[in-house]
Amino acid sequence: MKKLALLFSFFTLALVYQAQAQTSGAVISFKENSIDFGDITQGQQVAHTFVLTNTGKQPLIISNVAATCGCTVPSWPKEPVAPGKSAEIKVSFNSAGKVGKQNSVVRIYSNASEPIEKVSLISNVLNPTN
């Protein structure tokens, strides 16, 4: 019985330590993680700036930001984002050659507790009227 209690205590402490380790690093919080442009005309370019805040206790380092296709181009801060500070990820979408519902996903790779975050640009691309 004592061994069981000791084992239980060990696992409880391990879980608490793991939870503490995960929350003591950088944490990304987005003001919004998607934007819907509604109907746009084929060939139109749209852009949005996603604002993020590092709500963690360590500097946030964004190592890469990647889009699902070449029609979506992100730009992001290359310098660390201090705890409590905000930064911007700017994303543009070129609808040339696209028709119908579009959902361009952008992945943000960082040292945050959740190392991959996603934001998306949603639109419905209409054929141009001649």
Give, region by region, the residue ranges found by the protein language model:
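Short, surface-exposed loop/turn segments at beta-strand-coil junctions that are enriched for proline
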Residues: N94-G100, N111
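A mature extracytoplasmic/lumenal domain signature
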Residues: N64-A66, F93-S95, S123-V125
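Bacterial Sec-dependent N-terminal signal peptides
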Residues: M1-G25
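Long, low-complexity ectodomains and other extracytoplasmic segments of secretory-pathway proteins
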Residues: Q20-Q45, V51, T55-K57, S113-N130
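Extracytoplasmic/periplasmic beta-strand context in beta-sandwich domains
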Residues: S63, S104, E117-V119
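Short, solvent-exposed loop/turn segments enriched in Ser/Thr/Gly
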Residues: Q42-T49, K98-V105
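Surface-exposed binding patches on compact interaction domains or structured appendages
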Residues: K57-E88
